[in-house]
């Protein structure tokens, strides 16, 4: 679908309002075009009649003009009110579509794109699109109708002078077209630069605690100043082009008046034109110049709106790498058997992370993955949830290839507890309920008790209605972790992934949370990724992964007797041996 056709699709639900808006704009144009003719008639004929005739007709004329302008005012109200509502509705529809698309896109998209730039598309771009969606067609319609209507009327009054005005207008349009190209380039550049500014701002504010803890405020100020100044230079370039565009058009508008005076005077001197007709031309020039100014604004609005819509379309045209297959079925009655069959994965052609992994995990079994950073432990679990697709091999749950089941049913059966806990802006209850939206308060309390966080919550003045702060800034790391565990208790999945769930906590917090995790992992297939080896001693099987793939596997005691890589890690951690 072309950009223009896609844009028009958003008008469909509001086509009644749209056409009524244009109809009201048409009425306004007719009124504006009629007044110079009425005034010309009055000065050239009506006011030259006798006093009695003028007195008889002037009140009728006044009432007619009054009604005409009341109708125009009502039309103006509709255009200003309902037209803007239509634009706001379209903006809302686009914003929802964009957000929905962001929810569908795969992790690989977010690996390559900056959040600040994505935010810019949701906020700045859509505002410009909304302004264009409402004002664009309306302004274009009014302007063209007035310009064409004025020319037709002027041509019927005295075509030689109208033809001269048309010549000046054509030159003006050629100038506008040439400047238009330059404006398009600068507006696109502006969009890129404001995205960089938003990205820099979000990065700095999101990491403000790190910034201040390292006393690196000056570095962040310099970084932001750099992107801010680049945006400023881009805007200056844009304004230079815009200034040339608007200044040139202003010159041509003045030239139209000069043309009327000079050529009109010559025609009067030759006896081909009378002063009243020239005055009528001058009145229509005012009607004619006003829409030209609106057209100038329209071109600027068009560039902003369509630049934003093209960026909007770039996202909407993105095809999620991870999607349900055509005949995908729901994953039901899950026991929790997991098979990694010759699984390999690479992010890029030259970046192989996992190579030929074969692993069978029985339902209810506790498996631990151990290895150096970058060995693919977290990636292996990401493949299980289909955040990425395997490059080679297959992953099966209860014998079903995960590519053959729906993403929603797959991920609904997998619970994830990570080191970096993300809490949404909202209350503690809302954050726990994220594990199963629609859960009752009693179910949320039950999950919190299992996660050993209920007593702490009840000690707070507002209890479960306590506001967490942005990303949970009002809570400690251990408290946030227990809330995330409560989420998974509420979700009640058959498969559990613990990804460095306690590595960032102090010993006391780890002790409390480890008990919660042990309760959580009961009767579930559990995969634990850990650097603290004390947390996995009781695992049914420990798998050591390094750059070459699966290196060792067995229970804690078996691997210690093997005296290999795992034993080395364990001794370094607990005995301080080389």
Predicted features, each with a name:
Residues 1-32, 47-61, 78-83, 87-90, ...:
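Membrane-integrated ABC transporters
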Residues 15-16, 107-108, 124-133, 137, ...:
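An intracellular "coupling" helix at the cytosolic face of ABC transporter transmembrane type-1 domains
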Residues 16, 23-24, 68-87, 138-145, ...:
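Alpha-helical transmembrane segments of multi-pass membrane proteins
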Residues 18-75, 155-160, 271-275:
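Transmembrane helix-loop-helix hairpins at lipid-water interfaces of multipass membrane proteins
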Residues 23, 27, 31-35, 75, ...:
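Hydrophobic alpha-helical transmembrane segments of ABC transporter permease domains
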Residues 48-50, 54, 60, 153-167, ...:
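Helix-loop-helix
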Residues 88, 96-128, 199-223, 227, ...:
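Short intracellular "coupling" helices and adjacent cytoplasmic loop segments at the cytosolic face
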Residues 325, 331-578:
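ABC-type nucleotide-binding domain
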């Amino acid at each position: 679908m072309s950009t223009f056709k896609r844009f028009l699709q958003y008008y469909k639900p509001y086509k009644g309002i749209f056409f009524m808006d244009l109809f009201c704009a048409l009425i306004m144009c007719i009124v504006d075009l009629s007044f110079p003719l009425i005034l010309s008639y009055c000065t050239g004929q009506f006011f030259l009649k006798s006093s009695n005739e003028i007195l008889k007709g002037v009140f009728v004329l006044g009432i007619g003009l009054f009604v005409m302008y009341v109708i125009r005012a009502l039309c103006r109200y509709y255009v200003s009110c309902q037209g803007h509502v239509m634009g706001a509705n379209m903006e809302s529809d686009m914003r929802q579509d964009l957000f929905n698309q962001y929810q569908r896109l795969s992790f690989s998209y977010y690996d390559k794109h900056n959040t600040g730039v994505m935010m810019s598309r949701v906020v700045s771009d859509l505002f410009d699109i909304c302004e264009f969606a409402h004002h664009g067609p309306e302004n274009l319609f009014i302007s063209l109708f007035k310009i064409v209507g004025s020319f037709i009327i002027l041509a019927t009054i005295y075509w030689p002078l109208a033809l001269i005005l048309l010549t000046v207008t054509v030159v003006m349009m050629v100038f506008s077209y040439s400047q238009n190209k330059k404006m398009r380039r600068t507006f696109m550049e502006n969009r890129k630069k404001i995205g960089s500014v938003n990205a820099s701002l979000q990065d700095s504010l999101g990491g403000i605690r790190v910034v201040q803890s390292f006393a690196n405020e000056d570095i962040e100020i310099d970084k932001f100043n750099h992107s801010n100044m680049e945006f400023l230079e881009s805007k200056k370039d844009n304004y230079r082009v815009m200034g040339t565009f608007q200044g040139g058009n202003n010159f041509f508008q003045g030239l139209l008046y000069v043309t009327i005076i000079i050529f009109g005077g010559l025609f009067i001197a030759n006896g081909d034109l009378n002063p009243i007709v020239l005055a009528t031309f001058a009145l229509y020039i005012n009607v004619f110049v006003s829409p030209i100014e609106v057209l100038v604004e329209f071109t600027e609005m068009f560039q902003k709106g369509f630049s934003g819509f093209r960026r909007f379309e770039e996202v909407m045209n993105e095809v999620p790498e991870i999607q349900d297959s055509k005949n995908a079925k729901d994953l039901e009655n899950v026991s929790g058997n997991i098979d990694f069959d010759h699984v390999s994965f690479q992010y890029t052609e030259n970046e192989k992370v996992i190579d030929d992994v074969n692993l069978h995990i029985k339902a209810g079994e506790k498996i631990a993955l151990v290895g150096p950073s970058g060995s693919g432990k977290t990636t292996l679990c990401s493949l299980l949830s289909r955040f990425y697709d395997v490059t080679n091999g297959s992953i099966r749950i209860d014998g079903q290839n995960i590519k053959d089941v729906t993403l929603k049913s797959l991920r609904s059966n997998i619970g994830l507890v990570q080191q970096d806990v993300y809490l949404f802006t909202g209350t503690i209850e809302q954050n726990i309920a994220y594990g199963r939206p629609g859960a009752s308060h009693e179910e949320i309390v039950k999950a919190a008790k299992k996660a050993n966080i209920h007593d702490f919550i009840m000690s707070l003045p507002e209890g479960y209605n306590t506001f967490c702060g942005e990303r949970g800034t009002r809570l400690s790391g251990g408290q946030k972790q227990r809330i995330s565990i409560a989420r998974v208790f509420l979700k009640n999945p058959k498969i559990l992934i613990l990804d460095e769930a306690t590595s960032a906590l102090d010993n006391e917090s780890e002790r409390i949370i480890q008990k919660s995790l042990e309760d959580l992992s009961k009767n579930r297939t559990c995969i634990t990724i850990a650097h603290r080896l004390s947390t996995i001693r009781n695992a049914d099987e420990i798998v050591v992964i390094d750059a070459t793939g699966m290196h060792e596997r067995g229970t804690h005691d078996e691997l210690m007797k093997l005296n290999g890589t795992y034993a080395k890690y364990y001794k370094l951690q607990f005995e301080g041996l080389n």
